[in-house]
């Protein structure tokens, strides 16, 4: 469960390392974000000499959460960290590589470019 002020790892090579969620896109007063939700975040830590800088406000999609994800077939998936991928206004990833496993649910949410770049889809 991701809520405002939650710190996230970045699962791509866009240049950001750590994000902090500041708003959940969707309903006006949603409290928590889950896998596949788009959030507004601020960059807390960035790699030097990259296009993204610290304190820049960006959008990101959640790809991993520590909170369990329950599927219709009864399977429960839980990750070790909270992670997101930086996206642009057209919902395409800003990076060219994705690190770590991501959930299959992103394919149904039309994040097919992220799914195709991922090394492992659970």
Curated annotation (Swiss-Prot):
The keyword rRNA-binding applies. Keywords: Chloroplast, Plastid, Ribonucleoprotein, Ribosomal protein, RNA-binding, rRNA-binding. InterPro entries: Ribosomal_uL14, Ribosomal_uL14_bac-type, Ribosomal_uL14_CS, Ribosomal_uL14_sf. The keyword Acyltransferase does not apply. One of its GO terms (molecular function) is structural constituent of ribosome. GO terms for biological process: translation. Gene3D superfamilies: Ribosomal protein L14 (2.40.150.20). Belongs to the universal ribosomal protein uL14 family. Binds to 23S rRNA. NCBIfam families: rplN_bact. Part of the 50S ribosomal subunit. This is Large ribosomal subunit protein uL14c. It comes from Morus indica (Mulberry).
